[in-house]
């Protein structure tokens, strides 16, 4: 965290906790994230994939601005409301979630529940090499399964711009580019 603080704004934009959340529960890192918060370093935390909604609530309590995966929030109305209230964006990774058996099929992927609840979601690859995917494939997978078109893709991209760990000026320029493209 101290190293991240030294380089914040010079190639470092946040602190991330990623990995096997079932083996290394999010709660074990509370002191680390409290320290990051004290140093004003934004935080993203891997939660709600292998572990349940309790890991998502812990990530929120620890100050996460974004949550890697968080897919299990879709099965709990209170957790979705918590994410919405705190303006926390979920970094969804459909192919990875299929590979790890979080869902049995893309048709069962609960992205619509999250969107309908007003939770901000982005589309991501997780580990491109392990999952043998790319961002274009992730978007196409969802477009095919849920009939998503430009409107939904634009929404995902807007959420990504808004949740990015950068200045408001850059966020606005990203959004303008998205608007121009769509």
Model-derived features with residue positions:
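Glycine-rich phosphate-binding active-site loops on the catalytic face of alpha/beta enzymes
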Residues: 66-76, 129, 167
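Glycine/threonine-rich flexible loop motifs
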Residues: 100-101
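Short, electropositive alpha-helical surface patch
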Residues: 1-6, 140-147, 178-182
């Amino acid at each position: 965290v101290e190293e991240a603080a030294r380089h914040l704004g010079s190639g470092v934009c946040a602190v991330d906790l990623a990995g096997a959340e079932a083996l290394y529960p999010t709660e074990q890192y509370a002191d680390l994230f409290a320290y990051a918060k004290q140093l004003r370093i934004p935080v993203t935390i891997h939660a709600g994939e292998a572990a349940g909604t309790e890991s998502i609530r812990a990530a929120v309590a620890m100050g996460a601005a974004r949550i890697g995966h968080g897919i299990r929030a879709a099965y709990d109305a209170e957790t979705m409301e918590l994410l919405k209230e705190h303006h926390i964006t979920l970094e969804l990774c459909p192919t990875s979630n299929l590979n790890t058996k979080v869902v049995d099929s893309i048709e069962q992927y609960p992205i619509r529940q999250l969107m309908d609840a007003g939770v901000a979601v982005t589309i991501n690859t997780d580990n491109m090499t392990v999952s043998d995917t790319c961002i274009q494939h992730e978007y196409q997978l969802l477009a095919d399964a849920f009939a998503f078109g430009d409107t939904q893709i634009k929404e995902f991209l807007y959420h990504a711009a808004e949740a990015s760990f950068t200045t408001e000026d850059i966020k606005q320029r990203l959004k303008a580019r998205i608007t121009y493209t769509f």
